[in-house]
Regions:
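Formylglycine-dependent sulfatase
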Residues: 1-138
């Protein structure tokens, strides 16, 4: 049986603002429990800002000057792979809860495809399970 993989990427949370990271005022009991059974990364950096290009860098493993998706909404060249596409090749079914702030390569889409008009589509390879569009209150 394959191991399950839960990859959590959050937007604008400081790494040190959790009680499991020894912050003196932060209380994060549910995340603390998850962290006890997880791998946490304490020595990393964002390759670029803003968030969409940073996620693209993280999910493709490519430097921004290679993937060239350097602003929110910039399409990712379809020739590049990502963690979801690679996971599918070995039998996983990647699900996305949230958003990636990437847009699909328009050269491979029908001109009327709705993916041409938004950057809120999930990155190719992911199935979107739960998506909260920007600007909509919870």
């Amino acid at each position: 049986m394959k191991k399950s993989i839960l990859f959590i990427c959050v937007d604008q949370w400081r790494w040190d603002c959790f009680s499991f990271m020894k912050h003196k005022n932060a209380l994060s009991p549910n995340l603390d429990k998850l962290a006890e059974e997880s791998t946490t990364f304490t020595s990393h950096f964002a390759g670029i800002v803003p968030c969409g290009p940073a996620r693209t860098t993280m999910l493709t493993g490519l430097y921004p000057f290679i993937h060239r998706s350097v602003t929110n909404g910039a399409p990712l060249d379809k020739r590049f792979t990502n963690i979801a596409k690679e996971a599918r090749k070995i039998g996983y079914d990647p699900k996305l809860y949230g958003y990636t702030d990437t847009s699909w390569d328009p050269r491979y889409l029908d001109p009327e495809d709705e993916k041409n008009f938004t950057y809120e589509s999930p990155m190719e390879g992911f199935d979107s399970v739960c998506h909260l569009p920007e600007g909509n209150p919870v």
